[in-house]
């Protein structure tokens, strides 16, 4: 209030101050994070998200050729769009690592023609190319498309669409090489180089552009993390206005 002095106590803790973490675990987390998340979760700073969302990712180093030989499991992630682009990613698993091996990216503005749900379902059929797909993880707002896929016999799961937590989980899995982007996924790699934090919002939120492959990759990562046990993901600390 005006005319009164309000006392405040500021306490600063770092990850090293947590007695519940062994030195080995602390070292693992220190290797896991970079940039803003390192400053927050390791150094204990209240840092704003800025710059590229996946600033640690170097396509020349981190994008990989599609591995030769068979994959054990297959899944597809989908970010639905009619006016905005549609993105589908085909993921194959080998030795505990999931590779994004192929993609469909359809931009109706660029192509000059919108597609129907049935036409998008046909694209999914061609992407799957006869492989046994465990499930299709879809943008939860795409109700009509989800119904079209289910009518065609696809096993569909509505994605967890928590953006801030999903970005952290995706970053963790990329850094751990639990998910790998293959060099065949050109539109996904293009978006990786353009996907930025929106510094105008005052909270952890990316700009709503160059985010279609980014969204479906996030859907896949959240689905994968949800079925894992004993994994680590910080999902409780976020910056708000």
Could you say what each language-model-derived stretch is?
Residues 95-208, 227-241:
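Mg2+-dependent endonuclease catalytic cores in nucleic-acid-processing enzymes, primarily RNase H-like
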Residues 18-78:
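ATPase catalytic-site recognition across NTP-hydrolyzing enzymes
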Residues 1-6, 65-67, 170-174:
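Short, conserved catalytic or adaptor-binding loops enriched in Gly and charged residues
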Residues 13, 42, 79, 88, ...:
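A residue-level signal for conserved active-site and pocket-lining positions in enzyme catalytic cores
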Residues 8-12, 75, 156:
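Conserved beta-strand scaffold positions in the cores of enzyme catalytic domains, especially
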Residues 69-93:
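Gly/Thr-rich phosphate-binding beta-strand-loop-beta motif of the actin/hexokinase/Hsp70
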Residues 207-229:
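Acidic, Mg2+-coordinating catalytic module of metal-dependent nucleases/exonucleases
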């Amino acid at each position: 209030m005006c005319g009164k002095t309000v006392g405040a106590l500021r306490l600063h803790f770092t990850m090293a101050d947590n007695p519940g973490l062994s030195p080995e675990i602390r070292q693992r987390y220190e290797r896991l994070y970079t940039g803003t998340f390192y400053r927050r979760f390791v150094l204990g700073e209240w840092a704003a998200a800025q710059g590229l969302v996946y600033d640690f990712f170097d396509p020349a180093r981190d994008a990989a050729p599609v591995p030769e030989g068979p994959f054990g499991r297959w899944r597809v992630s989908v970010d639905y769009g009619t006016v905005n682009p549609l993105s589908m990613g085909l993921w194959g698993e080998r030795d505990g690592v999931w590779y994004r091996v192929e993609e469909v990216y359809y931009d109706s503005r660029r192509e000059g023609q919108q597609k129907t749900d049935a036409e998008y379902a046909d694209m999914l059929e061609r992407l799957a190319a006869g492989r046994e797909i465990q499930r299709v993880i879809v943008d939860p707002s795409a109700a009509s498309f989800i119904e079209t896929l289910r009518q065609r016999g696809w096993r569909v799961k509505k994605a967890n669409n928590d953006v801030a937590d999903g970005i952290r989980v995706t970053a963790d899995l990329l850094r751990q090489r639990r998910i790998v982007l293959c060099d065949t996924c050109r539109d996904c790699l293009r978006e990786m180089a353009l996907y930025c934090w929106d510094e105008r919002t005052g909270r952890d939120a990316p700009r709503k552009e160059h985010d279609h492959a980014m969204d479906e990759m996030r859907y896949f990562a959240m689905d994968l993390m949800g079925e894992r046990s004993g994994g680590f993901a910080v999902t409780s600390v976020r910056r708000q206005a």
